[in-house]
Amino acid sequence: MEIFNQIYILCSGLISGVIIFQSLIVASSIFTVLPEENAGILLRNLFPKFFLFLIFLSSLSLTFSFLANLNFYPFGFIGILGLLSMSVCYFIIPKTNQARDEKDDSLFKKLHTLSVSLTLLVLFLNLAVIFLIS
């Protein structure tokens, strides 16, 4: 059971690290290095993979929370929230891109804000695991 516990913690750390790396380093660097047109093309390629990877890690996290026999609340709940939140982010990508292409700034801003908010929620919940598990 201890190995499952360690893998659960590792998954939470990976989720947090991937979000921080993608948000603070990759996305911000792309906008400073590439022209806006090319940055958009690259980000449209990266973000679906980013969300799919987080869905995968959240699924692992949820699985290992059960295998480690951790309390559903908060540990399994964090996995479910991660899985659902990142799925929403993934599935709104086409509408977000369409809003950007059609210059529907209001809809784009709402969808982008939803995506960022859900990603931050998942980040904070997974960072909290370190404090909750000890």
Please state what every model-predicted region is.
Residues 1-134:
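Polytopic transmembrane helical bundles with strong interfacial aromatic enrichment
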